[in-house]
């Protein structure tokens, strides 16, 4: 679907009567602007730009072939006399290559310039290497080896074959040889050679005796490989397509003129039918472009010379361009540029010395969805919005009188620019396919009739833009058309205004909504200029817009969506063929083969992928694979369709999800839910998007949603597809901006299904008759099968058959057995029967069961049903309603299913029975060792004895006594029995209370107090009773004081020991510098390391450690910890263990404050005991020392690095990891976090002033 | 001359409703295009096909007994036939023409006025209703099912009424109930009667393939068996007008009133003042596959039994418990084997026996043990091939007959000798169950044979020990020296390994202990052969898996499918030919059975050799061919190699079309050839004459039957009793007829002519007289039949 678009045509001046053109290939990136022309036995060097400076570098008569040898940087010239010399292009120095004494007819170098082929005057084919050593020589008319000649494989005789339109009599015709008999001497005797692109084969065309013009195929070894099939009337040009599949030779038939295409083996393969007669317009030159895309045919008729450019697609030859030249200044030669990147550049040299350089580019001419293809005199138009017509067919064909060179389609107008420089204007093509009115023909005015216009572009309704280049500058032309004043009815077009730009303009882009601005780009420096149209219709170059590194081949101005109204912003998309794609100079992609803008997206293709870029933020939103080599033809936004053309020419239309979502989104915005759902279904879009697209809007317009959807089945689909997931953030995130998505306040994504179903259900419930099916679906989605059944059941009363249908629908969604259970759960036998009859259940089984149930009283029936359905709580409530006769069963049921609390609630009215439940509950509680609760329950259940026992077990002595009282048991005795256990539990005070209350033995009272070290209390009691304190209390107290003192001393010692040891270890580690490494060496033998804690050093990898113990069980783990925290000297983790021990110790010490204070106070109270005061003072002193020692040492022990603060973390994870610190950190990680900080000592005022 | 049929063997067609057990105790079933009538209680404990009824021209799809002497059948030839039978066969038949496509199911019922109401359903999506009275039949209604099919239909007289109820199942998964119009307009005029649809029974979730009615007290019970694996029982109970009016059950009030919960009833008005309530009685689930046939039986004390046959290879008899729940009482079926399942099943008239026919056409019969009613034992039955039978061969002394068929099996038929009774013939073994259609067969010795299928190799087999034991026992063989020799060395049996293609010998049989240990490997054992000591001819499931013969050798040599085989009388040579279109492939290969080497290739023919025959003394080998020629090869003295000595050519061959068959006279003096142009020629060596290609063999007698193609010919094994020059020949034709001729010195005389019911109804493929003293002839044909005749000369 591509056309050749003329980028520029520049005119240069060269040498008159040129014979050959030599272009220097690119050297070091830059192309030399010097080229060589052979004319009049001389070789001229021509400077392309600047002043035309001709330099003769060699002079040789009768030049038959020249070649620029790239490696040698020399020009190889062959003369008819047989001389082959090498000429240095700079100095003009010559050196002899070789000599052929019989003279040379033709010379051709292979494309890789390794081999050269000559045909001598004696029709010998000579093949030489680049150093002119002969590889092979043989006469042209040598016969093929017999084993290489054609073999008839026998597809039957000619008589039996099908002859198509020639009919059956064709079978009987003898092949006439008359055409061959013609005197071959009359033919052009030229010999021409053409190499295949890879240099493996070449073809020599010559006139053979008897046969006339024919050709032979030789390989690069000089061996004759094939001869041509017998064909009459071949002409003298021959050219091998560089990709190698065809040899093109003009051939004349009685009824048609063709370019015959032969295969390598010399067999005719197919042909290209020419639109003219070879007799009248003989072909002078055939040239394939270097990339094989374009075939240029130069013809010479009597009155004018023409150049035809053909391309092939889908095996159809399209005539894309026709250039017409007057005979007054005839053409001398055609030459396709061989340089990289300039494959579509054609050099045309005229006899007068004029040098025209045409630069074409392939482009798709699209007008929204309409794409046109030029094919000679026909314009093939297809509207891809309506149909995908595969080329070479098309929706409509417009025929013109002359060949079309370009056309512009914009909006409803169509401008066709033909080879004779007329413009045909048709202004109403929006009715494509219907009869088009006859176009207006615009004649060029005098100025324009001589200009070859390039870059024809539509600008505004009555203006066109075009460029015309000459030498180094370009004129931008604004063309308008008007009525011819002299001849009414005749129209002509003319230059309205123009502006000259320095440099060659190769692309023009017009801003579609601007009307007065456009952009042009020049080849020379890659500059893009903004040009504006002034009010007086003159053009002005405003500013340089974007500077690219390399000039682009294609530029396009696009509007960025949403900006049209507020001053609009646009962007310039530029693409260099097969290269880089830019938006306003910002690089989007590499190796881009084609692009197209559709709505808000820029779509571009790479070799086998298609990408979508959002225009506003230039974010690539989606990609997909496409068939290899496909290029975009056009995109139809309205159908979300992208049409691709594959290399062979066939079309493929795809609906990319991004575009479809855009359409669906648009429909949703406009509230066209039905259409949106239809489109989603058609394009396999998940229906969740209907809701997720805009949650708030959906919620607010849910009524409209329901109204719009006329088919309830669609709603069912929608509901059943719902998922607890926001698709705009997941599957379809390409089209949505997650940050812009807002939700109603009460909505959460993980409850989406429920939310939507509730929402719709509320609405649908108002019009149940319309939304029966979706309502049922919604209930199923919500898990309310019962509600769904009720909807059907209600319907059943009015319309049984409809209810059957609804049930059928429900059965699609739910298993019939589940439904049966749900129906049973309604206790409505009618409903049960209704459902059961639709299932494969045997009536003989379910009927007796239902009848059994029905025979029961209602409540008990419900109980049985609930029990059957395992709804135990509900079952129990119904059983409770059954009353007395089921007490036993209820109790059993409660026990069985553990429904004690429920049972108590349900049986609130049944006070007597409740007691049974309490007892059962208590039994249960006792069984699970909740004795205190059990006691309470027993009490409520009236089982006081049991309550007492349970309370006793928990040593709840108040309750025990109260219960004992209730049971009128001897209180004292009960109380006494409790004292011992209380003491064992360390609850001395309570024990004392009991003893005091219930035992009159004062001694025993004191014993209890003293045993609990409750000296203050003892002193108080003694004081009250005037007992002798010293006698009873003092000895015990003093003994205790001494014991406490020694214990404090021991604590201090222990603390100091630990601390010292810790400091020693640390010092050792610090001293040895690499102390950790020393210890680490031992690690190998130590199996204390936990597998779960990480202690990997840079020296040790975890895998080298021995396997075996995993310390997985908790018992093992504790044992392991104990081992790890062993205080045994030499343990590699001793410091850790010490810290742990110290932490515990310090905490314990801090807790001593109250006991010490109390003890001291008690000692002080013993005023009469001589050694009490010193003891108290000593105690206080000892403790103080202890506390001070602790306090002083805290910071020494808990160093900052132990804490592992945030600072530490930095260099542990940063780029420069401090492995030492990392090791330490890992060691400290063995400690529980709490113990990595120094213990907070909560100090109270524990000292007695008097003891200081 | 009297010809009596000794044995007929044929399988039931692969259709549902294709077999029925009549009130007279006979089982009628569709066998190819014929209906076979079998007496399953022949001589008390045996079974025999009594006769065949031939009138259909295409496959018989369904048969149904209407009465003791009336049988209704339907076939693919779009006709239904009402047969009237007596002890010896058919007396009358009436062809019901009208359908345009195959008739699939039929039923008929006798009405109070003595006339018959017949219903037929066909693939042309119509059901036709006929009345039949006084040998006249009229089709009075055609029910069009638009584009659906009827799978099964039943007619039933309504209780307490003269109304007929028609139930049929269609491909819409429902059962339709139709009855006559209530309007009295056309009463008395049979043509005015019209059936109308009254109700559709829905509930099945797949096609309903079996229906049956039974009268239960005042009610009717309809059983429907479906491909959804369920059987549903529907109750059709008469209702009075009052009941009808009260009947309305309000589902919505069900929980609140005191009525018993019942299944919803549908009230139909089927007569002027007759209302019936239709309700679902029960749903039976027990089969794991499609259910094809259901059949009711009512015991003398009015208890109901329901039989259901399923594709899951089981047949279940259902009985109601006291609570009315239907439970399976007996489940019988096939165990193992490469079969699919049952296509139908029936109770016998007394309900003490049940019959089922399977996918491969085999019959099973189980009888209730009179002493232990829970015990159902399998009984003796006659089966047969379910594809065209292409070759047969008698054992050299006539002890058994072996047949090869396109159903990919070879079967061995032998007489069951019982004291005090005539022997009946049964299938005793199935030596080969193959993956290709069988084509040819040659017996090398009593316990060794070669067979050719539609493949390029000839396979040879030898009987296993287990067969020899059972064969001797059942057929009463004595003095079996060959067997004695083999018994010790032979394998016990054979089986086809799970992933194999050839029968492998099984030497050692796993002891019981081992086989009980269940491991995963045992699920797919390498062999599943179980030796069985037979008292009676074996049942189908035994035949299917336990009577294989181990394969001895594969003979490779032919380039195309094997076509004919022959062996010399002493088994010392085997000759084989294959399909051929040129002389190279048409060569005959001679094999040496002692070492299985090729001895020689004999050329002579241009096209496929259709049959081969060695002369009784093995001196000559005769071959006949598609190229309308015969060739005669003679063994040179003192060598095993044969040489072409005579053949016909275009000038002297009497036959102008393909020569189908050939045979030698027992004395080696004559040989006979028969061809498609209806010519039978007896050739005799007259004098040495080297000039002609015939080399002295001359046509001694030519018999030409116009418009017949003689596809089989055979000489008997002796002269006509009392003569020394009169030969007896049997001819079989393409139309299925068998003719017996005597041949005396060039003169033919027709002795007997068997019609299609007696002989075959499609091409006779092979005829052979039984070796031995008695004159017995075996025949096989494309109609799946294998028959043995006893010929008595009068």
Curated annotation (Swiss-Prot), chain A:
Q: Name the GO cellular-component terms.
A: cytoplasm; cytosol; elongator holoenzyme complex; microtubule; nucleus; spindle
Q: Which terms are listed as keywords in the entry?
A: Cytoplasm, Cytoskeleton, Microtubule, Nucleus, Phosphoprotein, tRNA processing
Q: Where is this region: Disordered?
A: 1097-1116
Write out the ranges of the annotated region (Mediates dimerization). 814-1252
Residue positions where Phosphoserine is found in the record: 1094
State the residue spans of region: Required for binding to tRNA.
Answer: 1111-1129
Principal subcellular localisation of the protein: cytoplasm
Instruction: Name the Pfam families for this protein.
Output: A-sol_ELP1, Beta-prop_ELP1_1st, Beta-prop_ELP1_2nd, HB_ELP1, TPR_ELP1
Q: Where in the cell is it found?
A: Cytoplasm; Nucleus; Cytoplasm, Cytoskeleton, Spindle
Q: What is this protein called?
A: Elongator complex protein 1
Q: Which organism is it from?
A: Drosophila melanogaster
Organism lineage reads as:
Eukaryota, Metazoa, Ecdysozoa, Arthropoda, Hexapoda
Swiss-Prot record, chain B:
Q: What compartments host this protein?
A: Cytoplasm; Nucleus; Cytoplasm, Cytoskeleton, Spindle
One short Pfam name that applies is WD40
The answer to keyword tRNA processing applying to this record is: yes
Whereabouts are the WD repeats?
A: 55-93, 98-140, 147-188, 203-244, 286-328, 337-376, 384-423, 433-472, 557-601, 604-643, 654-693, 705-751, 759-794
Subunit composition and interactions: Component of the elongator complex composed of Elp1, Elp2, Elp3, Elp4, Elp5 and Elp6. The elongator complex associates with and stabilizes microtubules; efficient interaction requires the full complex.
The written remark on domains in the entry is:
Folds into a two seven-bladed beta-propeller structure which is required for elongator complex assembly.
Family the UniProt entry places it in: Belongs to the WD repeat ELP2 family.
Q: What is this protein called?
A: Elongator complex protein 2
Native organism is Drosophila melanogaster (Fruit fly)
